Amino acid sequence: MPLSEDTIKAVEATADLVAAQGLDFTRAFYERMLTRNEELKDVFNLSHQRDLRQPKALLDSLVAYARSIRKINELHELQEQGLPVPAERLAELQGFFAVAERIAHKHASVGIQPAQYQIVGAHLLATIEERVTADKAILAAWSKAYDFLAHLFVRREEEIYTETESSEGGWRQTRSFRVEEKAQITERIFRFRLVPAEKGTAVALHKPGQYLAVFVRDPRLSPHRQIRQYSITSAPNHTYYEIAVHRDKQATVSGYLHDHVAVGDLLKLAPPYGDFFLEYREPGGQAADGQPSPEPLALHGGAVNFAAERMTPIVLISGGIGQTPLLSILRFLAEKEGQAAIRPIFWIHAAHDSRARAFKAEVDAIKVTDLPGLRTTTFLSEVDETMDKKGEDYDFAGRISLDRVPGLAELEADGANPHYFFVGPAGFMVAVEQQLKAWSVPEDRIHFEMFGPFKPLQ
């Protein structure tokens, strides 16, 4: 049901009050909820609670919803009545719906259920009452507004669950997989090949760029179940998935996978999810995974069908472990287009040093045997002049600069309309986006993945 004018006005009037509370509001909300409903500690990433990434993401999303609630309600009314939605109205809300789609996929990956929205809503309203206002009319308005939003998420997440479950090799919630291969590829990165525990059964095709959620329960790690998402590095296939797991000082689950998971062990996995992927619809309107393609409301390249637009350049830009989802895209393009590829394809990678280049040999091999037109450029923050050879181990020393990538600025200036896919550490991603904006690249050609809770790059 659409929201009433009174409800909309009440929420709009208090949006700034919630924003003014800042992280104190969302920290209080999470503390209240996770204390009273400890079972949710099996769902939420507690590391993101400690570093405040999740509270910050929730605050930003909640305030954005409250400030956009009128336009969202109007759009919903048009859709419910089967009326056409003006393009300018969609454009106004593109950012909000992109974030919502990203959240819906993340929720699906951890198995969020409708009943959990009721728990979240109860604690959200209690936190508003404790920290913002006890006015009954305003609380009632927020309750209706939350129910409205929860309904949209529940409906979208059920669509995601159903689509995945109904595909060949698909499933819902979790499924057991066996570690078929485990290999160390750098000092801090292990590669895992995962196959179904039930021998001979198929796995769902992922969209190149998506991730898997790994579910771990081990008292050596935590008294609570831990869930982490890892980008799939393999090309879509019905036999196996590959992930590359990077270990850093704060990575508890990644460290567990490095130290305690061996070949033959079983892991629980959710199906592939994620709104960051290369859209590649074959003739007949089907996506690469055989499923109907979604409406292009998320940042996934949906505005361009790269199967049909064979000349559209693709630029893959990564920093550090951010190359993992882009490797899946590159492998996919190598299989789909191979030596017949006529589009320009760029692989641009920034690493700390040459020892951290996890997939150099594979990318070089793809360039030689599969995509001879692939244009590779490497930036190293630190160069060892006694060991690193320019033109072989790296191309440029220092931070990434797209202006220095041979042929890229000219391609953009010539109106070839490249699409840019980039992933990496936060500072790297801000720098890349700033460089693209300096070239006046429109948002519909900029696609990025954010590891962890979503936040704007600006």
From Swiss-Prot:
In this chain, the stretch annotated as Reductase covers 169-457
Q: Which cofactor does it need?
A: heme b; FAD
Bilayer-spanning residue ranges: none
Q: Which residues bind heme b?
A: 107
Q: Where does FAD bind?
A: 211, 228-231, 450-453
Instruction: Name the EC number(s).
Output: 1.14.12.17
- Domain FAD-binding FR-type as annotated: residue spans: 172-279
Q: Which UniProt keywords apply?
A: Detoxification, FAD, Flavoprotein, Heme, Iron, Metal-binding, NAD, NADP, Oxidoreductase, Oxygen transport, Transport
InterPro entries in alphabetical order: Cbr1-like_FAD-bd_dom, FAD-bd_FR_type, FNR_nucleotide-bd, Globin, Globin-like_sf, Globin/Proto, OxRdtase_FAD/NAD-bd, Riboflavin_synthase-like_b-brl
Question: Which residue numbers mark the site Influences the redox potential of the prosthetic heme and FAD groups?
Answer: 106, 449
What is this enzyme's catalytic activity, as reactions? 2 nitric oxide + NADPH + 2 O2 = 2 nitrate + NADP(+) + H(+); 2 nitric oxide + NADH + 2 O2 = 2 nitrate + NAD(+) + H(+)
Q: Does the keyword Coiled coil apply?
A: no
**Chain sites annotated for binding NADP(+):** 320-325
What this chain does, per the record? Flavohemoprotein involved in nitric oxide (NO) detoxification in an aerobic process, termed nitric oxide dioxygenase (NOD) reaction that utilizes O(2) and NAD(P)H to convert NO to nitrate, which protects the protozoan parasite from various noxious nitrogen compounds. Therefore, plays a central role in the inducible response to nitrosative stress. May also be involved in O(2) detoxification.
**Stated family:** Belongs to the globin family. Two-domain flavohemoproteins subfamily. In the C-terminal section; belongs to the flavoprotein pyridine nucleotide cytochrome reductase family.
Q: Assembly state and interactors?
A: Monomer.
Q: What is known of its domains?
A: Consists of two distinct domains; an N-terminal heme-containing oxygen-binding domain and a C-terminal reductase domain with binding sites for FAD and NAD(P)H.
Protein's name in the database: Flavohemoprotein
Organism of this sequence: Giardia intestinalis (strain ATCC 50581 / GS clone H7) (Giardia lamblia)
